[in-house]
Amino acid sequence: MPGAMRQSTSNLELLTIYEVSKILGSSLDLQQTLREVLRALAYQLQMHRGRVYLVGEDNVLRLVAANGLSNEAAAQIEFRDGEGITGRILKTGMPAVVPNLAEEPLFLNRTGGREDLDEQVASLVGVPIKAAGVVVGVLTIDRISDEGPQGHFGSDVRFLTMVANLIGQTVRLPHVAEEPLRDAETFRMQKELRPIAAPINDVVCTSPNMLEVMAQVHRVAPFKSTVLIRGESGTGKELIARAIHNMSPRKDAPFIRVNCAALPESLLESELFGHEKGAFTGAQKDHKGRFELASGGTLFLDEIGDISPNFQAKLLRVLQEQEFERVGGSKTIKTDVRLICATNLNLEEAIGHGKFRADLYFRINVVTIHLPPLRERRQDIGPLARHFVAKFAKDNGMTLVMEDEALEVLNRCTWPGNVRELENCIERAATQSRDGIIRTESLSCSLNLCNSSVLFQYRTLGASVGGLAPSMGPGSVNRVPPGRPGVPAPANAPKAPAMPAPVPEPAGAGSAWPACASGCSAGPSPVCGAAQPAVPVPLIPLPLPEPSAPAAAAPAPTSVTNAAPPPAAEVPLDEPESGSLRDRLLWAMERTGWVQAKAARLLGMTTRQVSYALRKYNIEIKRF
């Protein structure tokens, strides 16, 4: 080819590229735009019968634009991967040249239109259309020659490759623009579906707040982040901790549990960090600690709020450095554990009182999961009750069902002991059923064995009874019972519900606990939902020794919310708002660790009076 002709062709190709780029940017109608591009190729460079095929979601090439074919005819033409010359280009991602279509056995001629060539020779040039390195289609054109097949198609391949690249970018642009929208829509749908998380392990729940907890467990499980589980006793903190471990990449490694409240400080250090032989009396061999045993897995520290401030400093160092020494040893041991902590205490309040280190709090409070008490997820009482009934029946090889009336009674209870108390209640009722049916009369309320009212009274006052956490929200636990003698009550302090009247008993019989009336079946009450008679609990005054001098007149009672209470020595023991004497005595003994002298000071009594009252009400002294 003479130099002048070569220069002219190059200029024409450059002009055509310019026209193609203008066409591709002129309209959002892809099919119409591609037809205009093919017409420009035919008009400028005599590249006839242009075809543009695009890959569908099923990986099939479909004809979307063609010179000389109607849209209806083009819609019927498709090629699969490796089928014909066009399919080969898709499969290999490489250009293809057929000098003479009439002699090519792979040519399928599905588009037709070449029957009127007479003595002319048709050659085909095809190139892949790529976007971001991926083949998304094929561009083909025909070269018609009167002088036989051409010998060189290199310039056509290079030119068509540039055109195909422009087409590929045009095809990809709408998808690129839609990706953020699709991602946002996907995120929105996932967020809406999060509360509908699949149940895990033995966690039975249908209430929205527990479903959100399940979704939170699914989100946090894949990571190594420390988790702090907060909730009242009996809400299932260990169950959630095990679920997080079982759904994590560490599920095949150990899950080690330590109850920090059950071990004294000296023993807790040995249990967590281990000890060397001879470290102390009785250490006859080396002992691996829980941090060492849990390496590669999960360590669950239950009741972490009960460890002493001195030990908290040692624990903080391990959590920060992921290394420790055994008791009596000097070798530093590296560990790789995921830490999950749980508590039913108000750690923020404990920090304010100097009982919990703030730096340890910030170390463990990375991801917090709040477990709602059972009274705040009443939708779960029915499913949980049926689950425990089925579990008891399976464990004991029997058939057991529960009446709807009994379930209604359970739905009206307050459950200060949460799910654990519900399970125990179901088990008690199951043992009382005679024919495999749990009826209303099988429940503890009907048998005067329900202690929830007493526990609820102390919990409402803010006291911790036997390890049962006071009523707490996401972060509020009142450890000081409002309105107790000698302590002013806050203005918004909750008032303890009235104790239900005891069920009449035969003469001579004594009930150590106030009981629910009517089996909790008549109507709502502060505790179990039972209607209670409007009769105050009988108060038995405590006999006091004769005073040596006339006592001053007691001041008139005042409201605990409007004025400060009188001095402890002047508080009458049978004050109606203070509850029965027996209840106040139990409260004081629990508060003071069953030390009579301290309880006496708390109640404004003498030690002798407290001792007499304990004997009178048959209250057994707890020994620790």
Swiss-Prot record:
Highest taxon, organism lineage: Bacteria
Binding site for a divalent metal cation: C445, C450
DNA-binding positions: 596-615
Domain Sigma-54 factor interaction: 203-431
Gene3D superfamilies linked to this entry: 1.10.8.60, 3.30.450.40, Homeodomain-like, P-loop containing nucleotide triphosphate hydrolases
Keyword DNA-binding: yes
InterPro entries: AAA+_ATPase (IPR003593), GAF (IPR003018), GAF-like_dom_sf (IPR029016), HTH_Fis (IPR002197), Nif-specific_regulatory_prot (IPR010113), P-loop_NTPase (IPR027417), Sigma_54_int (IPR002078), Sigma_54_int_dom_ATP-bd_1 (IPR025662)
Region Disordered, residue ranges: 477-508, 549-578
Residues annotated to bind ATP: 231-238, 294-303
Xref: Pfam families: GAF, HTH_8, Sigma54_activat
Region feature C-terminal DNA-binding domain, mapped onto this chain: 582-624
Composition skew (Low complexity), residue ranges: 549-563
Keywords (A to Z) from UniProt: Activator, ATP-binding, DNA-binding, Metal-binding, Nitrogen fixation, Nucleotide-binding, Transcription, Transcription regulation, Two-component regulatory system
UniProt-annotated stretches for the region Inter-domain linker: 432-581
Transmembrane portions of the chain: none
CDD domains recorded: AAA
GO molecular function, one term: DNA-binding transcription factor activity
Any one of the GO BP annotations: phosphorelay signal transduction system
Ranges for domain GAF: 29-171
Subunit details: Interacts with sigma-54.
Cited function: Required for activation of most nif operons, which are directly involved in nitrogen fixation.
Protein name: Nif-specific regulatory protein
Source species: Azospirillum lipoferum
Gene for this chain: nifA
